């Protein structure tokens, strides 16, 4: 059944919001400029979807840091939404794929943060094809992304990977935000979200693919 308060959202409306954020992000983080057209193409694909996107109240800032494991199971914390977003946007119904994308991005960070900490040049072009640590990080990420999507499908009755274009667009929107954040706060970490943007705009066909 539908989640409480669910309502349809226009895909073109979502895509327009993503594009506006992309333009602003490219101004703040010029490293994004070479990817703007490819990212916008993903957004445009969502804008052209024939059916509305089901939306309801979501967490809005879901990632591994918002989870707490207890003896009674997992708890989800902090339902205030994205800290940088205005309050009216945090309260607005949104696609649950936003929260799924947040978790998938979090798996990337969990793997590649460790890699980058041990090898600052891990993402250098001359290293990506031969680095065993990078290969293991990608494999770990792919395995955990798939496990999360499998579990989500069992509990929610909807496999996020069946919403590939929408999920990929939400992942890109999150990664674009991360590039700006890292540019301002931790420049050495910019390769983490930037590598995901490269993957997500290079013909990935599955929301769970880690490339």
Model-derived regions: residue spans:
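A conserved short helix in the protein kinase C-lobe
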Residues: 105-108
